UniProtKB/Swiss-Prot annotation:
Pathway assigned to this chain's UniProt record: Cofactor biosynthesis; 7,8-dihydroneopterin triphosphate biosynthesis; 7,8-dihydroneopterin triphosphate from GTP: step 1/1
Biological process annotations from GO: folic acid biosynthetic process; folic acid-containing compound biosynthetic process; tetrahydrobiopterin biosynthetic process; tetrahydrofolate biosynthetic process
Key words, A-Z: Allosteric enzyme, Folate biosynthesis, GTP-binding, Hydrolase, Metal-binding, Nucleotide-binding, Phosphoprotein, Zinc
Record family assignment: Belongs to the GTP cyclohydrolase I family.
GO CC terms of this entry: cytoplasm; nucleus
EC supergroup of this enzyme: hydrolase
Other observations noted: Present with 2840 molecules/cell in log phase SD medium.
EC assignment: 3.5.4.16
A GO term, aspect molecular function: zinc ion binding
Protein name: GTP cyclohydrolase 1
Purpose of the protein: GTP cyclohydrolase 1 is the first enzyme in the biosynthetic pathway leading to folic acid.
Quaternary structure (record): Homodimer.
Stretches for region Disordered: 18-55
Length: 243
């Protein structure tokens, strides 16, 4: 009965953003089956490169970092910086390892199950770390993911892994929030998906306006969660009155 009422509420409600004919998310889907979103040639190459090609990539990045350090006025031959270019290159590849992750083969695998559960499933307080694509400095915080099953559920740890995959790329928080929501929607075809993210951005804390106490909240509501009552229930369960 709950699902019937929810479907009726969805039908009465405005068409969800991701299926509007004129929506940019319909014309240019932000989530492909391999997990990329508007991928460049370089991300494809990186995902498919051999171990030897990865070593060559590390050397190229190291060379670029040496140039940057030199232009900053540093001596790249002093003891403290001798191995820094190599370490930084490996660190950056780790921070952006999501470019090498396949959403179905590496993240979801066989963790989608038939189940007749028809109430919200919520995983709260998933910690995420990412890099702002504008300044290449970190932003970090927590993401809360909820969905209403439609005969299928997913292993709970996979929600955290899904968030991790998209976070380990050069990102903006708004896009990261949408990618998580739409990927889950694509995989499960649920009655609704809700994602709320709260993060602190080092580009606001350590430079520019330097507001150390600020945080940014973004959300993406799909399907049934675009209806006010369902959204309100989700936010109440998160301990929030609004977003």
């Amino acid at each position: 009965m709950h699902n019937i009422q929810l479907v009726q509420e969805i039908e009465r409600h405005e068409t969800p953003l991701n299926i509007r004919p004129t929506s940019p998310y319909t014309l240019n889907p932000p989530v492909e089956r391999d997990g990329f979103s508007w991928p460049s040639v370089g991300t494809r190459q990186r995902a498919e490169e051999t171990e030897e090609e990865e070593k060559e990539r590390i050397q190229r990045i190291s060379g670029a970092i040496k140039t940057i350090l030199t232009e900053l006025g540093e001596d790249v031959n002093r003891e403290g910086l001798l191995d820094t270019p190599q370490r930084y290159a490996k660190a950056m590849l780790y921070f952006t390892k999501g470019y090498q992750t396949n959403i179905m083969d590496d993240v979801i695998k066989n963790a989608v199950f038939e189940e007749d559960h028809d109430e919200m499933v919520i995983v709260r307080d998933i910690e995420i770390y990412s890099l702002c694509e504008h300044h290449l400095v970190p932003f970090f915080g927590k993401v809360h993911i909820g969905y209403i099953p439609n005969k299928k559920v997913i292993g709970l740890s996979k929600l955290a892994r899904l968030a991790e995959m998209y976070a380990r790329r050069l990102q903006v928080q708004e896009r990261l929030t949408k990618q998580i929501a739409m990927a889950l929607s694509d995989i499960l075809k649920p009655l609704g998906v809700a994602v709320v993210m709260e993060a602190s951005h080092m580009c606001m804390v350590s430079r520019g306006i330097q507001k150390t106490g600020s945080s940014t909240v973004t959300s993406c509501m799909l399907g049934g969660f675009r209806a006010h009552k369902t959204r309100e229930e989700f936010l109440t369960l998160l301990g929030r009155r609004s977003i």
